[in-house]
Amino acid sequence: MQDQLPTFISSLQTIPFGTAFGYLFVLTLFTAFNWGLEAFKWKQLTFHLQPLSFKAAYAAILTGQAVSFSSINRVGESIGKSMLLSDGNRLKGVVLSFVASASQLLVTLLFGLIAVIWMYPSLHLQLQLQLQLSELVLSAFYGALFFLVGLFILCYIAIPFFANKLSKAPFFYRYAYLLASIQTLPKHLLLQLALVSGARYLVFLLQYLLIFKL
């Protein structure tokens, strides 16, 4: 990565200043808009736990981003987002943030599956030529891929059901109060979170396209 940095810098120097500034300005706007979408998700998720204004939800997202930069594998993001909640709701907020992350992961898997379907002819040929895989093995691979994505979709829809079952398990019984906010999540909210996550993914995609144009 460091070896490619001089090449990247030299390529930036060949771009007219006005064009580069315009691209960077648009990229910055997209980033702010993306955080706004995530703030909307957080506002909707915490509504029954602790109603937040959009401004407070946006501040929570920025706090989560700041904490995640100083943590390993961004694990501090959930903690950072919950820091602006009241004392009794912070741990519940951390649990809720995993639902937001699950909705984003769901969309990422779906778009990945769409990419596999779109690239199927060339991907299928490359796997056959380079890895010498038989048709049976490839069929099993594609079948497992579809199955796992489908299973994740079902698990996402059933998050309230699993939370309810876990809260009654002996080991999790003492932590049942943390799962209470998830048990009552309506399915339409889970769908709404997935749709907003899809919009975030499209914004990410546009940002990458703009970067490739630099």
Q: Residue spans of the language-model regions?
A:
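Predominantly cytoplasmic-facing regulatory/coupling regions of multi-pass membrane proteins
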Residues: 1-61, 118-214
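Transmembrane alpha-helical segments of multi-pass membrane transport proteins and ion-pumping complexes
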Residues: 35, 39, 69, 73, ...
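Extended non-transmembrane interhelical loops and adjacent amphipathic helices
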Residues: 58-84
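Transmembrane-helix boundary and interhelical linker motifs in polytopic inner-membrane proteins
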Residues: 46-52, 77-91
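Membrane-interface alpha-helices at helix entry/exit sites of multi-pass transporters
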Residues: 54-59, 88-102
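Short alpha-helical linear motifs
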Residues: 81-85, 103-106, 116-123
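Membrane-embedded alpha-helical segments of transport systems
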Residues: 63-71, 95-117
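Generic hydrophobic, aliphatic-rich segments that mediate packing or membrane embedding
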Residues: 41, 62-63, 75-79, 90, ...
